[in-house]
Amino acid sequence: MTDSHYIGRFAPSPSGELHFGSLIAALGSYLQARAQRGIWRVRIEDIDPPREVPGAAATILRQLEHYGLHWDGEVLWQSQRHEAYCEALAWLHEQGLSYYCTCPRSRIQRLGGIYDGHCRTLCHGPENAAVRIKQQHPVMHFHDALRGDIQADPQLASEDFIIHRRDGLFAYNLAVVVDDHFQGVTEIVRGADLIEPTVRQLSLYKQFGWRAPGYVHLPLALNEQGAKLSKQNHAPALATGDPRPVLVQALRFLGQRDVVAWQEMSVEELLRFAVAHWRLTAVPTSANVNPAFSNASR
């Protein structure tokens, strides 16, 4: 049962199984929602087929259930949302808020990676072209409920970024904004690696005239080399055995109260304890090395 208007979400891409870093994002968003007696949704962001691993989406859902992170309602699949994205693109085009761009990637790289608006005043058609937002509402800073005021890179914030790729795929920033609005998400809790695109997403909310959600960016889990745990650098998948010691490690990583005698608790009892004692203010803001799971019983 829920009795608040809070709606959170966890939105993994099916590019591989969940790892400890993924669990931090899932658990943090889950606890933030449940502590406010809110709704917690799951969305599978499967709009980039070349990056997807066959069977990964089903595995991710099984992993969430194995770790006791049960979501509300049906899972939303981005691969089934193309019509909504097309409608959003069409509306932006009709309002004169987007344009076609034929600039090759090599040209943008020569510019230092920030697009200069070269095609903004040209009249390209859709053939062999990407679609860029005509930036009208650059967001130079935003409030993070954990980190406070975050300043954006002015060049990045002002850029006419891509919302529909030349290869026909929808860009992440467009899809995530359309779907978070559709699902009524009131706060997005995710990893700090997504701080940078937040200002682009907030500018899209302004372009559409939609109310934006709040944001919380959790610390990243790092490997021993100091790199973010990710599927790209072959982070090990979550253990398939007893989930409790891994959950305890994740709670410690998030700066939460130690769970005394967790060995005597079920997964459900452990998570109820975590919800009851959840404190966002205790979460650290700096990235940290992934703790060894074998130390969970200390």
Swiss-Prot record:
Family the UniProt entry places it in: Belongs to the class-I aminoacyl-tRNA synthetase family. GluQ subfamily.
One cellular component (GO) term of this entry: cytosol
Bilayer-spanning residue ranges: none
NCBIfam families in the cross-refs: PRK05710.1-1, PRK05710.1-3, queuosine_YadB
Cofactor(s) required, per the database record: Zn(2+)
Motif 'HIGH' region, residue range(s) on this chain: 12-22
GO biological process: glutamyl-tRNA aminoacylation; tRNA modification
The protein's name: Glutamyl-Q tRNA(Asp) synthetase
GO terms for MF: ATP binding; glutamate-tRNA ligase activity; zinc ion binding
Lineage: Bacteria, Pseudomonadati, Pseudomonadota, Gammaproteobacteria, Enterobacterales
Binding site for ATP: K231
